[in-house]
């Protein structure tokens, strides 16, 4: 007997939504303004928080408020072929950060790198992190933005993950919603990359008047559900005024309420 697919409202009601505070540029001193557990169950923190005197207190509060916590952009691998001493320094520094986060009770973090980073250079930087990832049980996310100019890029990224042979290395999918082709399905755009996603950033330019609609997010909810996704969906609005994120956060809660209404969809998407 064929298993019935869950509807989008059912998926949305069971998903972890929140705000990507680090990716949105929210100053560390304003983080507490977005500790809104009555609306959200997930959050992304800026790596700069780790360097502040208030870090232990804030992180304890975050872990008390949210079920799904990650720290963004903890390190940037070298863009080109790095010398051995630089690789060792990167591995040691990043390994220490991973250990510290794990001891604090946070088990997910992301790296940051540009599109200019060569795959082989990235692999050489990532492989020395395997012992720290194994020891701590941390999940390390690599950002991948959609849409991308080359349709073969998702397949190449999958190959990079496989070549790394690091099971804790997964994907953070950055969806630039206004740029997504309206007639292309998630499968068309991402292919089997969807199987490796552990977190989704929903990106839009608030200063340009952009704001996502439920018709943009619903297909991705359904597609990732089919791939067993149980990660977080984080709003990451961009603005010249980083404090605008609070306004966007409350608008996002209204969108989530729409997605969770039975009228949002009466049957599963066929993607």
Locate each region found by the language model:
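Histidine-acidic metal/acid-base catalytic patches
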Residues: 1-21, 25-41, 91, 95-100, ...
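Active-site groove signature of glycoside hydrolases
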Residues: 102-118, 136-146
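Hydrophobic residues within beta-strands of alpha/beta enzymes
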Residues: 43-44, 74, 109-111, 140, ...
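Glycine-rich, proline-tolerant flexible connector loops at the mouths of alpha/beta enzymes
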Residues: 42-66, 113-117
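Glycine-rich anion/phosphate-binding loops
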Residues: 54-58, 83-98, 120-123
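Alpha-helix-loop-beta-strand connector modules within alpha/beta enzyme cores
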Residues: 58-77, 125-137, 162-166
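N-terminal substrate-binding region of glycoside hydrolase catalytic domains
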Residues: 32-54, 75-78
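Active-site beta-loop-alpha junctions enriched in small/polar residues
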Residues: 20-24, 46-50, 74-79, 114-116, ...
């Amino acid at each position: 007997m064929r298993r019935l697919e869950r509807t989008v409202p059912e998926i949305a009601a069971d998903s972890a939504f929140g705000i990507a505070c680090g990716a949105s540029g929210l100053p560390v001193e304003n983080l507490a303004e977005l500790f809104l557990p009555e609306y959200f169950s997930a959050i992304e923190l800026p790596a700069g928080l780790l360097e502040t005197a208030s870090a232990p207190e804030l992180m304890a509060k975050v872990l008390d408020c949210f079920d799904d916590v990650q720290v963004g952009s903890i390190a940037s691998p070298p863009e080109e072929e790095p010398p051995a001493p630089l690789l060792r320094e990167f591995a040691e520094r990043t390994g220490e950060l991973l250990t510290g986060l794990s001891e604090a009770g946070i088990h997910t973090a992301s790296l940051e790198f540009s599109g200019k980073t060569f795959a082989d250079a990235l692999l050489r930087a990532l492989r020395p992190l395997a012992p720290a990832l194994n020891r701590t049980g941390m999940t390390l996310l690599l950002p991948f933005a959609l849409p991308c100019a080359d349709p073969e890029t998702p397949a190449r990224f999958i190959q990079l993950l496989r070549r790394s042979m690091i099971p804790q290395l997964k994907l953070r999918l950055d969806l630039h919603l206004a740029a997504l082709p309206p007639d292309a399905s998630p499968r068309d755009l991402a292919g089997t990359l969807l199987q490796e996603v552990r977190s989704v950033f929903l990106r839009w330019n608030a200063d340009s008047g952009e704001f996502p609609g439920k018709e943009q997010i619903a297909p991705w909810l359904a597609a990732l559900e089919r791939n067993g996704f149980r990660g977080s969906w984080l709003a990451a609005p961009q603005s010249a005024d980083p404090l605008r994120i609070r306004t966007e956060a409350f608008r996002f809660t209204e969108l989530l309420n729409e997605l969770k209404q039975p009228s949002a969809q009466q049957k599963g998407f066929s993607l």
